């Protein structure tokens, strides 16, 4: 089950808009904070926050049945 869950999550993340996906991966998989992600991508911290929020909304919509588990695992 765990492998299937992570596979579905990875596929859903790959479908995120490019900039949103970059921010999401940097913050949630690479452990960067908002400031570091903003510096790396040369965007504002507010843009990082907005992209993270947008990514979570898209994933929540696309993975409704699994979202509570993702929220628990990743603190979304």
Where are these regions (language model features)?
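Acidic, proline/glycine-rich intrinsically disordered inter-domain spacer in sigma factors
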Residues: 1-11
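Helix-turn-helix DNA-binding module
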Residues: 11-14, 18-22, 30-47
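Residues within the DNA-recognition helix of helix-turn-helix
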Residues: 51-54
